[in-house]
Amino acid sequence: MLQLLVEFFSLTENQAYNNMSSKYTVTVLGGGSFGTAVANIIATNGHVSRLWMRDAARAERCQASRENTEYLPGYPLHDNLVATTDLIGSVSTSDIVVISVPSQSFREVAKLAAPHLRKDTIVISTTKGIDADGFFLMSQILEQELTDVRIGVLSGPNFAKEIVQNQYTGSVVASEHDEVLKCVQQVFSSNTFRIYSNPDRYGVELGGALKNIYAMVTGMAAALGCGHNTMAMLLTRSLAEMGRFARELGADSMTFLGLAGMGDLVLTCTSDLSRNYRVGFAVGRGKSLEQAVQEIGQVAEGVNTLRIVKKKAEELNVYMPLVDGLHAVLFDKQDLQQVIQGLMTGEMSSDVDLQGGL
């Protein structure tokens, strides 16, 4: 089986990308776990890789120890990776800029980078979230703040820790620019990290943001001791809600059958490596939302996304019972068991909307 995986990840598509002679300069803005993992892949692939951090002391420790002790302790970084606090010098000389910061900081960082980007720079977002002020996805913020650049997103079932462990991983790059798709596949792909392409940037990005909500739902279910039947029901109903919501916003609901939809949903909803899953698990065990967020010590994007999506779903009149139920528990302080009973005894509905796609 392992040999089959090795052969799969070494198929001609990835071989072609990795054998190309072009050497790129890439800056990753954001020294968290995923930004570090991405920067490390790029460095390992032989490109110039810079990892920008705000905190000078952190950057110095990372550069000296060859390890991101705060977010990926115990995993050595490639010698080609340079940790820096020089944003201007880094982005002004980069072919590709990757923004990998929490959604609350995304616009600020985009504004910092904007005056220093070269024309036609490829700018990639890896942030999975939604800006509450206008319901903007991260790539839409890039369109608002940047000019004369080519924009894309990278999303999928990707835990940073497993990426740096060289676990076999698939991800999706999405952009309306074919050259962005090809370039990211070339620069980011490796023998253990396989990049697929999709022109539906909006759908890919929505999938990455929405699944965080449902990870909290399944985390709660796990804390309550629910069985496999329950988890299967929750996953499939979550996918249906995601597809319904995305279709109303103009995305291709079929995107949600791929890595950025179903793939990311399954990963995030079934693993305690997920921060959002752990928040849900803690709440299911009786802790308040505030206690749960404090306990994990890192940003759980699903908490903010839930508020935003609940409001938007009401505006669009989209049926999202899991979103409604989770919001009732976390923010309206309704009893969890009563909410569950309400979901199970609510109005009957169809399983799959064949005309709509999901």
From Swiss-Prot:
GO terms for molecular function: glycerol-3-phosphate dehydrogenase [NAD(P)+] activity; NAD binding. The active site is at K211. NADPH binds at S33, F34, R54, K128, A160, R275, V299, E301. The keyword Nucleotide-binding applies. Keywords: Cytoplasm, Lipid biosynthesis, Lipid metabolism, NAD, NADP, Nucleotide-binding, Oxidoreductase, Phospholipid biosynthesis, Phospholipid metabolism. Sn-glycerol 3-phosphate binds at K128, G156, K211, D264, S274, R275, N276. It catalyses: sn-glycerol 3-phosphate + NAD(+) = dihydroxyacetone phosphate + NADH + H(+); sn-glycerol 3-phosphate + NADP(+) = dihydroxyacetone phosphate + NADPH + H(+). Its EC number is 1.1.1.94. The keyword Nucleotidyltransferase does not apply. Its main location: cytoplasm. InterPro entries: 6-PGluconate_DH-like_C_sf, 6PGD_dom2, G3P_DH_NAD-dep, G3P_DH_NAD-dep_C, G3P_DH_NAD-dep_N, NAD(P)-bd_dom_sf. It holds the Pfam family NAD_Gly3P_dh_C. GO terms for cellular component: cytosol. One of its GO terms (biological process) is glycerol-3-phosphate catabolic process. Pathway: Membrane lipid metabolism; glycerophospholipid metabolism. It is found in: Cytoplasm. Signal peptide: none annotated. Catalyzes the reduction of the glycolytic intermediate dihydroxyacetone phosphate (DHAP) to sn-glycerol 3-phosphate (G3P), the key precursor for phospholipid synthesis. Belongs to the NAD-dependent glycerol-3-phosphate dehydrogenase family. PANTHER family: GLYCEROL-3-PHOSPHATE DEHYDROGENASE, GLYCEROL-3-PHOSPHATE DEHYDROGENASE [NAD(+)] 2, CHLOROPLASTIC. HAMAP family: NAD_Glyc3P_dehydrog. This is Glycerol-3-phosphate dehydrogenase [NAD(P)+]. The gene is gpsA.
